[in-house]
Amino acid sequence: MGRASREAPKRLGEKLLQIRSTLGLSQEGMLRRLGLGEDYGRHYISGFENAEREPSLPVLLKYSKICKVWINVLVDDELDLPANLPAHEMHGGIRRKSVKRKRKP
């Protein structure tokens, strides 16, 4: 019995970079804000933002608390982050408009 593979969120790295940029933090600053500090280097945050590595659930929960959005906003590619971060209260994200695709005949 192995682990079932799952599709990784495609926009997660983009959202994590947006959070850090909006908060005006360096990668080291983000590490400190996440409470990871000296245990990890800048490359750890860079790996998340470049989609080279997926953050663990506890790290995603910390991102969620820092910017006051529900965790599903981070991992659901159909949801966008709110314009203002951190949100004034927990935010459920902004649903992207669905694009109707033309069907092939």
Regions of interest found by a model, annotated:
Residues 14-35, 62:
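Short basic helix-loop element that most often maps to the first helix and adjoining turn
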